[in-house]
Amino acid sequence: VDVDLKANTTKAENYRGSGNVYGQWDFLKHFQFKAMFSLDYASNSTRTYTPVIQVYDASVEGDIATLGNGKTGVSQAKETEMKVQSDYLLTYTNSWGDHSVTATAGFTTYYNKLENLNGARTQGVGLVIPDNPDKWYVSIGDAATATNGSTQWERSTVSVLARVLYNYK
């Protein structure tokens, strides 16, 4: 197998940005409010070339066998994903004598969205797709062999929380 044929057959661009910010406010001596926000965004795109690979096989006529369908091919995919979270917490803290109490209540939201689109084509009769990254797009090749797919979804959650801690001495 000429493994060099499979080398450098994918071009990819991947970008990602993420960050978070929070604010805190102490008020009325015993209260604290905190708000937190975070965002994570990713964008990925790939283009892949599939060459014709021939191998030595003594059991076939001519001693050379072709792996797969014997056609060159290209595929492309584009995916984006976004995750957003927000948290809001209110805390009351107080102590008197040998007693102390900390009470926390909160509200949290989470959102996740994914979109993926992909497609592929193989060569037509007499129209070999060249091993050239400038040609690795699904607009080349035999339109009758085109395949495509997609995935997309959105998910979200909302949560409420509460906790009370009491200490004596």
Where are these regions (language model features)?
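Outer-membrane beta-barrel transmembrane strands
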Residues: 2-48, 74-95, 102, 114-116, ...
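Extended hydrophobic secondary-structure segments that form protein cores and membrane-embedded regions
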Residues: 102-108
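Surface-exposed loop/turn segments flanking beta-strands in extracellular/periplasmic regions
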Residues: 1-3, 51-70, 115-147
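Glycine-rich, aromatic-flanked loop segments that form ligand/cofactor-binding clefts
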Residues: 109-113
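Flexible domain-boundary/linker segments
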Residues: 38-40, 52, 107, 122
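Extracellular low-complexity Ser/Thr/Asn/Gly-rich intrinsically disordered segments
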Residues: 68-70, 76, 106
